[in-house]
Amino acid sequence: MKQICCTILLFFAFAGSHAQDFADYFQNKTLRVDYIFTGNAERQNIYLDELSQLPSWAGRQHHLSELPLEGNGQIIVKDLATQQTIYKTSFSSLFHEWLSTDEAKETAKGFENTFLLPFPKQPAEVEISLYSPRKEVMARYKHLVRPDDILIHQRGMSHVTPHRYLLRNGNEKDCIDVAILAEGYTDKEMDLFYQDAESACESLFSHEPFRSMKDKFNIVAVASPSTDSGVSVPRENQWKQTAVHSHFDTFYSDRYLTTSRIKSIHNALAGIPYEHIIILANTDVYGGGGIYNSYTLTTAHHPMFKPVVVHEFGHSFAGLADEYFYENDTMTDTYPLDVEPWEQNISTRVDFSSKWEDLLPAGTPIPTPANKWEKFPIGLYEGGGYSAKGIYRPAHNCRMKTNEYKEFCPVCQRAIRRIIEFYVP
């Protein structure tokens, strides 16, 4: 297995060295693409909403036609004239999660989704695909982008939201740019927001591998003001006017704090270089969520704020799965047991060799008994991805399993490190 891993790494090094040059195909600007994902549990569709141009590109300028993770959706950009693939990215969405709910069996809905792509120099074809938990195509949509289109909305040239850098290690093209956005903070509460953003930053960089790779990041706190203080709690009939319209009770789950108004997030960030997003909610009620390559959203004043913001960023930044599970429950709608999940920290053993098999010490029992966790810090422990049976995690405990544990397990640390190195070699 070690030989296979070395071969894979050499392949990526070779591919990267012979990949197209960013400047051959792209301007130093961002193409923001807004979509609407619609449908129900039976049928899904994708519709183009709007195209926008942002003043600069903060994303990667290498590994352009490669994916770090499969995700639940993918975007492929091709040069229209040559049909050469010039950019790829992957993602997950709140829409994907909603499709597994009872509500999706009874009604159809639409969800906003926004993605950032490098702005092409020449006409390009964009293809976006949504995948089921079985990795089958649910919906696919193609459209053209003509860079001289006068209806591409120019954003971020003025009326930029006030912001302050908490960490700046270099130009946006040389670092991973994370924006921390205020939600439920009034103009008079922005000093509190900046303090909370500092706390989130401090917590993130107290965890490996973020701590040792801190110089790869820029962190900017964005003071997006809300009319009302706090966030909406529908079960208590509290609806507030806030910057990104977040609320608890997502999918009727008390603690699930999200927003479906994705465009409001990106509108608040227009004109500020960013790739990844953390939203801090001005409330002491426990809750939050993290969606791969979409956003992290968490409450800022609950005692568990610091571990939760790191856990949720593990989802949104590195595509890590939840390692906790419910006794006597198997959620096969989320993770079918005959399909290997794309997340790097759980396995159904369908393709365990693609996960952390190479990290197991010789003699590690497969599966690893729960009472042997002290002897085997890395193993194959049953229970993860919300299911007590059939899904396995790498360690007895981890930041992706409980709030009380102090760090990411070695497998999650490697997964995060690989993502960082993919973005910033």
Predicted regions and their residues:
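Solvent-exposed loop/turn segments at secondary-structure junctions
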Residues: 184-187, 225-229, 283-287, 303-305, ...
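Catalytic Zn2+-binding segment of zinc metalloproteases
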Residues: 313-329
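Short pre-active-site segment immediately N-terminal to the catalytic Zn-binding motif
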Residues: 190-193, 288-312
